[in-house]
């Protein structure tokens, strides 16, 4: 009932409002006043009868009750306004028609949609008005812009322009800045509310900061620090019980259990037989080796250029389905069966050996001191390359010579040049006090270049003699830096006997007027060819020289006491590069380009030939014990030979990047070094044991740098101090360095 009454009331209200609207129209017509243009009024009047007809049909009782007097009373002529009707005026109508309630389905129009207040959708889109307001007046449709205005409006866009017209109001829809920002955030899948922070700052309620203030300010009780008396009593009780035997330890309990089991154990007579049967059943079969997997070395359809000329394989097939079966399959299977049947297989356990354990454990360099580590002094004075060095037996004097033909004597401790002289290739000697121009003058007057190839101090400290090789001449000189007693003792080495005819020409210093100012030239020896190396015998009476360019007199041995020279070989086997005496035996070591031969001078026979395995030997040095030899080569290798072990190298050391020029052993310490064209001097520790079963210990110690490389030539000569772990090196830069 309530639904029907509400529906009646709504129809009454709508009818009442429509009647009021019609009367207002009649009054406006009677007065001749119009609120709209003629065209609009004419068009609207054409639609009024249909609207009026609908109202009359809906409310038939309303038109019947109105009388002519009431029409005259409320006409437009009387000037009165139309009274407003309330819904109560239509409640008593008997002829009111009731309609069934309309149920709007899913496919029907959305009549319940929310619209703007006071407006509803008009079904008359072609009318000039679009709706009625709350007073029942017409709401005129806004004027539609022309095409030109629309174009201008699309160019001059307002702020927030969208290009959408609201169908309710007919006006363009403009968006605010907040709405544009909201749409932008939604399009970028962001949070719509810009004030919302999805990642707020983390507030660590439980920090790692230790609070200094305690929860309770009460002081710590004494029982926290004093040992517990109750625990002490309990420990005493347990200790007393253990001593009395009332409490057993775990070891005592285990021992008692073993004793009880041994006392009551039953002996099984057949235990060993069963174990033997079990062991017999478990045979250790070695699995057969697996077949190799198929390979892809050959193609069934290779290109033409890969086909062999022979009739063997590979053969070419057009497709894989025409490839025949393998012809040797049965043969290979049969051979495999024979191998599995006849060939024994052994199971070998794999040895897991750490590779580090196979390497020898070398001591650290700090444990092998002393050895040279830094440059403490530089001797500067030579012009050009310094080719040879030699230290006196006392260790106080250093002799050097080079391409400038000047012999210089240096004081080791101070680095001062105490004496120097220029030697030419004609057997003349010129003294040079302190003028360097005299050196250049003497070199310019000589018709042949004077290059000091080698020099060596004699092994006798009481009779100091320096042997200097300049081209084909050997000078025996005593510099004026020694005492008179030492000088007289050195003279006696050359005046004990007259000179004899030999392979070389001997001349006394006094006859040839080779007496230098302050120094003495005892004798000169002229050989047929240029001399490359010198080597003194340990007794100081013999000197060996080598000449690579000579064949019959490549090696000469000069005896100072007799004043004679002899050639131990009628013809040399190759170009002799270096020669040296054995330190303990009457042996002579001769190094050619690829071999080192050891000769017994007493028996005049070949003792051993060392197979170096290098292309060109450059230098040679013998250990003080005489059982070990090292050589340097131009192919960047240093070879260590153990004469008691083998004729092949015991160790091949290849640490330099260029050719080796010189190698040398220390006279008394377990050290040896090598100088190379890369400008480096490498120092090694080489300890030799008296036990023949122990191998020598070789440890790299230090790389000494700072030598200049001139025209691809670096270090040319090295020599050790006879007592200290000091090393002297000379190179192509014209400087001599002392390493300590």
Swiss-Prot record:
Keyword annotations from UniProtKB, A to Z: Nucleus, Phosphoprotein, Repeat, Ribosome biogenesis, rRNA processing, WD repeat
Places the protein is found: Nucleus, Nucleolus; Nucleus, Nucleoplasm
Top-level taxon of origin: Eukaryota
GO cellular component terms attached to this protein's record: nucleolus; nucleoplasm; nucleus; PeBoW complex; preribosome; preribosome, large subunit precursor
UniProt keyword rRNA processing present: yes
Record carries keyword Repeat: yes
Molecular function in Gene Ontology: ribonucleoprotein complex binding
Entry's Gene Ontology BP terms: assembly of large subunit precursor of preribosome; maturation of 5.8S rRNA from tricistronic rRNA transcript (SSU-rRNA, 5.8S rRNA, LSU-rRNA); maturation of LSU-rRNA from tricistronic rRNA transcript (SSU-rRNA, 5.8S rRNA, LSU-rRNA)
Primary location: nucleus
Composition skew (Basic and acidic residues), residue ranges: 21-31, 44-55, 252-270
HAMAP family xref list: BOP1
Family of this protein: Belongs to the WD repeat BOP1/ERB1 family.
Subunit structure: Component of the NOP7 complex, composed of erb1, ppp1/nop7 and ytm1/SPAC890.04c. The complex is held together by erb1, which interacts with ppp1/nop7 via its N-terminal domain and with ytm1/SPAC890.04c via a high-affinity interaction between the seven-bladed beta-propeller domains of the 2 proteins. The NOP7 complex associates with the 66S pre-ribosome.
Function: Component of the NOP7 complex, which is required for maturation of the 25S and 5.8S ribosomal RNAs and formation of the 60S ribosome.
Protein name: Ribosome biogenesis protein erb1
Organism: Schizosaccharomyces pombe (strain 972 / ATCC 24843) (Fission yeast)
Species lineage: Eukaryota, Fungi, Dikarya, Ascomycota, Taphrinomycotina
């Amino acid at each position: 009932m309530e639904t029907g009454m509400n529906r009646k009331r709504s129809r009454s209200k709508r009818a009442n409002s429509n009647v009021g609207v019609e009367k207002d129209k009649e009054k406006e017509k009677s007065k001749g006043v119009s609120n709209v243009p003629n065209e609009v009024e004419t068009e609207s009047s054409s639609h009024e009868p249909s609207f009026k007809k609908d109202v009359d049909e809906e409310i038939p009782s309303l038109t019947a009750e109105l009388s002519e007097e009431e029409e005259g009373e409320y006409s437009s002529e009387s000037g009165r306004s139309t009274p407003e009707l309330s819904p109560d005026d239509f409640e008593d109508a008997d002829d009111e028609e009731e309609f069934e309630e309309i149920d709007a389905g899913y496919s029907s129009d959305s009549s319940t949609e929310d619209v703007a207040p006071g407006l509803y959708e008009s079904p008359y889109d072609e009318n000039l008005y679009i709706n009625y307001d709350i007073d029942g007046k017409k709401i005129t449709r806004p004027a539609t812009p022309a095409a030109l205005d629309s174009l201008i409006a699309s160019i001059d866009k307002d702020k927030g322009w969208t290009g959408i017209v609201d169908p309710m109001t007919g006006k363009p829809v403009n968006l605010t800045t907040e709405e544009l920002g909201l749409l932008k955030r939604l399009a970028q899948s962001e949070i719509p509310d810009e004030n919302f922070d999805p990642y707020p700052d983390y507030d660590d309620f439980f920090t790692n900061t230790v609070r200094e203030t305690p929860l309770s300010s009460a002081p710590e009780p004494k029982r926290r620090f004093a040992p517990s008396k109750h625990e002490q009593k309990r420990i005493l009780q347990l200790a007393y019980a253990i001593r009395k035997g009332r409490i057993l330890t775990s070891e005592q309990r285990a021992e008692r259990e073993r004793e009880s089991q041994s006392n009551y154990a039953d002996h099984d007579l057949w235990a060993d037989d069963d174990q033997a049967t079990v062991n017999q059943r478990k045979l250790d079969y070695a699995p057969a080796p697996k077949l190799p997997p198929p390979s892809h070395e050959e193609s069934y359809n290779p290109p033409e250029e890969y086909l062999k000329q022979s009739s063997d394989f590979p053969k070419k097939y057009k497709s894989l389905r025409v490839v025949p079966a393998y012809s040797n399959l049965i043969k290979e299977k049969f051979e495999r069966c024979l191998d599995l049947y006849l060939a024994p297989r052994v199971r070998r356990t794999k040895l897991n050996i750490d590779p580090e354990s196979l390497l020898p454990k070398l001591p650290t360099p700090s444990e092998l001191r002393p050895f040279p580590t830094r440059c403490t002094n530089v001797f500067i004075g030579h012009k050009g390359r310094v080719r040879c060095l030699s230290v006196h037996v006392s260790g106080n004097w250093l002799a050097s010579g080079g391409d400038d033909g000047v012999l210089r004597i240096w004081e080791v401790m101070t680095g001062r040049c105490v004496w120097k002289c220029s030697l030419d290739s004609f057997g003349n000697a010129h003294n040079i006090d302190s003028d360097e121009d005299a050196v250049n003058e003497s070199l310019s007057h000589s018709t042949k270049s004077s290059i000091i190839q080698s020099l060596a101090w004699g092994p006798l400290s009481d009779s100091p003699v320096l042997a200097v090789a300049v081209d084909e001449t050997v000078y025996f000189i005593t510099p004026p830096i020694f005492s008179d007693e030492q000088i007289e003792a050195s003279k006696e080495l050359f005046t004990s006997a007259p000179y004899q005819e030999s392979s070389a020409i001997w001349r006394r210093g006094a006859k040839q007027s080779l007496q230098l100012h302050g120094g003495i030239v005892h004798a000169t020896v002229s050989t047929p060819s240029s001399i490359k190396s010198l080597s003194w015998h340990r007794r100081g009476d013999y000197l060996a020289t080598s000449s690579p360019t000579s064949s019959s007199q490549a090696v000469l041995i000069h005896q100072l006491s007799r004043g004679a020279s002899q050639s131990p070989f009628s013809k040399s086997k190759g170009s002799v590069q270096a020669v040296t005496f054995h330190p303990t035996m009457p042996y002579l070591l001769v190094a050619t380009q690829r071999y080192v031969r050891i000769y017994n001078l007493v028996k005049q026979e070949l003792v051993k030939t060392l197979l170096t395995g290098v292309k060109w030997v450059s230098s040679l040095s013998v250990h003080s014990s005489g059982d070990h030899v090292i050589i340097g080569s131009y192919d960047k290798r240093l070879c260590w030979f153990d004469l008691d072990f083998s004729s092949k190298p015991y160790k091949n050391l290849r640490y330099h990047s260029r050719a080796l020029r010189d190698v040398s052993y220390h006279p008394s310490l377990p050290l040896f070094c090598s100088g190379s064209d890369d400008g480096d001097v490498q120092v090694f520790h080489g300890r030799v044991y008296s036990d023949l079963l122990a191998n020598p210990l070789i440890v790299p110690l230090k790389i000494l740098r700072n030598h200049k490389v001139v025209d691809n030539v670096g270090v040319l000569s090295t020599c050790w101090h006879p007592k200290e772990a000091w090393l002297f090196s000379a190179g192509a830069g014209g400087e001599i360095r002392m390493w300590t």
